[in-house]
């Protein structure tokens, strides 16, 4: 192996400065629980009773939207498919667009109504459309929660309504809300086309929608995500925002009033943007390995996967990366074959090591090609 030297980190890395750790507590906010999480890496940047199971109200619909987006992105359903409202959907209380039994609406307008106006009737209609019944859909919600490691969560319905005795066990935590919010934003970014709408209409302009998340209008870079309120849950919010490539999720549960929940999320997001950065530099040009007996003389070495480095701004100047590559490699070389290592450091502390792999395949020269090369070298030696 050969060392190519230290370079200032300028590579899109998916690492965290303190992997698996929570930074020192951020601002204390007026809520029963709260968290601040980085979307790219999943790093928890601030917490306040993060794992306390509480009623989430309509923030539940983050999971509802996640399952809808999975169905759309997998091709199971399309944006222009029509959804028919059942009696169960039309009879949902709380926030709604007042669907009538038998009324049809496109998936796009259903999602818009859920994301912007927190429409319970549309959430139920989509649940039935995807799973056959709300109960079956709730099973899928809980299955997905387990897959994501949401260990504080038990869903009873797809809306977050707590007017049913069974809803007493409908619980999740601020941490789990951040987990599902991150999954939605990171892997299904098209949802932002809806969660960033301030005002819009459905039914051909006949019914107006106004976003319940006022941060969409008043917080710079806001990308969503979902409000919630019931008398039992209090005021809840999962708020996301992106600035200079860094996207954060702030979750608060159990605030006493709407003003407090927005102020709490603003405080958390402000703290995150003031103290953290996401680095995306490019690997030093010429990071390649010579290839013996190959159809190409060398192969470029690239990171073995998408990577991002979340750092404390106070340590920004101390970040370096050391690249170590093989002296050479013999063909055939497969795409993704390991060629070396990129070691990321903050001062003398090793933060993480990333494999460097072959960017493309290099085929081995055939016998005829080898003979031609040999004869050429003999001729040049005369």
Residue ranges and their predicted role:
Residues 15-16, 74, 283:
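Residues in and immediately flanking transmembrane alpha helices
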Residues 150-151, 168-382:
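Domain-terminus/edge residues, biased toward the C-terminal soluble/receptor-binding domains
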Residues 2-23:
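Sec-dependent N-terminal signal peptides of Gram-positive bacterial secreted proteins and lipoproteins
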Residues 3-4, 62, 243:
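Hydrophobic alpha-helical segments, especially transmembrane helices
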């Amino acid at each position: 192996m050969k060392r190519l030297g230290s370079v200032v980190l300028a590579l899109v890395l998916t690492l965290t400065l303190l992997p698996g750790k929570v930074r020192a507590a951020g601002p204390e906010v007026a809520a029963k629980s709260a968290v601040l999480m980085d979307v790219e890496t999943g790093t928890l940047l601030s917490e306040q009773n993060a794992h306390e199971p509480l009623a989430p109200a309509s923030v539940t619909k983050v999971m509802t939207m996640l399952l809808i987006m999975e169905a759309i992105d997998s091709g199971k359903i399309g944006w222009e498919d029509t959804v028919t409202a059942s009696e169960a959907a039309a009879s949902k209380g709380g926030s709604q667009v007042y669907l009538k039994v038998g009324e049809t609406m496109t998936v796009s307008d259903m999602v818009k109504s859920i994301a912007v106006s927190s429409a319970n009737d549309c959430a139920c209609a989509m649940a039935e459309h995807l799973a056959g019944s709300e109960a079956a859909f709730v099973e899928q919600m809980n299955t997905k929660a387990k897959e994501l490691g949401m260990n504080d969560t038990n869903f009873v319905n797809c809306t977050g309504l707590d007017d049913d005795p069974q809803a007493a066990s409908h619980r999740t935590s601020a941490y789990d809300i951040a987990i599902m919010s991150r999954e939605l934003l990171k892997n299904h970014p098209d949802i932002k086309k809806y969660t960033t709408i301030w005002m819009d209409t459905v039914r051909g302009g006949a019914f107006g929608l106004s976003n319940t998340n006022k941060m969409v209008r008043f917080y710079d870079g806001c990308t969503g995500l979902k409000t919630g309120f019931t008398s039992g849950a209090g005021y809840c919010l999962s708020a996301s925002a992106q600035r200079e490539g860094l996207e954060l999720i702030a979750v608060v549960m159990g605030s006493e009033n709407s003003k407090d929940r927005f102020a709490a999320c603003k405080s958390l997001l402000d703290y995150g943007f003031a103290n953290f950065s996401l680095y995306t530099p490019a690997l030093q040009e010429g990071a390649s390995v010579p290839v013996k007996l190959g159809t190409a003389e060398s192969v470029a070495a690239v990171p073995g996967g998408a990577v991002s480095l979340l750092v404390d701004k106070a340590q920004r100047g101390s970040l370096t990366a050391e690249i170590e590559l093989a002296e050479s490699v013999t063909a055939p070389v497969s795409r993704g074959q390991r060629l070396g290592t990129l070691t990321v450091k903050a001062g003398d502390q090793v933060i993480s090591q990333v494999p460097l792999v072959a960017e493309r395949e290099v085929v081995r020269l055939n016998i005829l090609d080898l003979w031609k090369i040999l004869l050429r070298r003999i001729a040049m030696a005369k």
